[in-house]
């Protein structure tokens, strides 16, 4: 199928999920094509008639903004910009993020406010549709002036430079372009700056983090419900009336989800000896709910961002204006990444506490969830693993957005550090997925000690699928294998 990049309607996270899942081919709408061409024509005419320097178009960049560049060197200026700014370091950015970077850069340029050539946007679409993913590096962006270094690496293949991942192999971009019958592009005035100035590195991470976070929010409720039954917990804390009198949206959603997940559970319905449960069970709606509300806020920030123009300077043909502003500054994203990381990390923190309770030898469960504790260590050490991951997340949740380091001789004297916030948040979310997998392994084991009583039909169906991969553990075995298998089950679980 094809997906039309259109400026007449917003693109949502749901749209992006559909594009990714359906492996859609991108095309530009007629209106987007007209906008791009009209903006470029306006700039060409403006350059021919105006002698006053325009930042980034016929001047240097950053603190070199007062250096005027002669007309016969403008194309070289743009090529030099891309080459000189491609100085990333560290690990290669995951291909799933690079794919999103291409998509979001195309989306931003389609508004016709950046004065790029139509063929430049077409070539970005060619890269996306042919699954030619530029090699980009994690380190190098300050999250202001756009994601300069990552976007420079993203743009190098347009010039026949740099490296790409194509068909699973790391190749020279020039070789792949030739193989596909594509010629390198010669950048015209302003184009290099339009390609590099933008927040698409941060935004791509944001889209990925939110798509994953939405799933983790649902998973946490489902796995938390399994743990509640495994722990022989009470149902009263999830009744609707207690949440209606404190009606935070996420709290209400979570309580409803727990009730639905446990509907029909024989374990939940049996008489209880204990008067109340620990907070990690009793307060699931309040804790998980707060994370849902935080995720919803961050979602609104990024849906605004991916439907924005974050180039500089910005070209307004209809107003006969070229404005040097600051839409490239990533502060809204940096703060949101820090917020999301903290919120999602709490799903992992409370999950580890439930694991600790399950292995503690209370509620008629054997110590460490194994029939012969002592001879067997059982589920003792997976909790250690969970604790180490929770601790790492606490370190990763130190805010990046409160930091700023002056750059470019003081011209760029405040930066967001949003790119660092993005890569940290990505790691936190990966860690929480592991923590929920550890909880599922423990909770499924605990449920077996409640037999012959059954949990809810929904949970029993899930556990039946789970047991096809990971059987009940009677005696000690290499737990790494069980943990990895559980993680893959969680990653591929369709909920």
Task: Give the location of each predicted region.
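C-terminal auxiliary extensions adjacent to catalytic cores
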Residues: 2-24, 28-35, 39-42, 47, ...
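FAD-binding core of FAD-dependent oxidoreductases
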Residues: 55-69, 73-77, 84-109, 137-159, ...
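Glycine-rich, flexible loop motifs
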Residues: 2-51, 81-134, 228, 243
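Conserved, non-catalytic sequence blocks in retroelement Pol enzymes and Pol-derived host proteins
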Residues: 113, 142-144, 374
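Cysteine-centered functional microenvironments
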Residues: 136-141, 318-322
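Short, low-complexity, polar/charged sequence segments that are solvent-exposed and flexible
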Residues: 73-76, 120, 213-215
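Hydrophobic alpha-helical context, especially transmembrane and signal-peptide helices
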Residues: 49-53, 131-137, 151, 172, ...
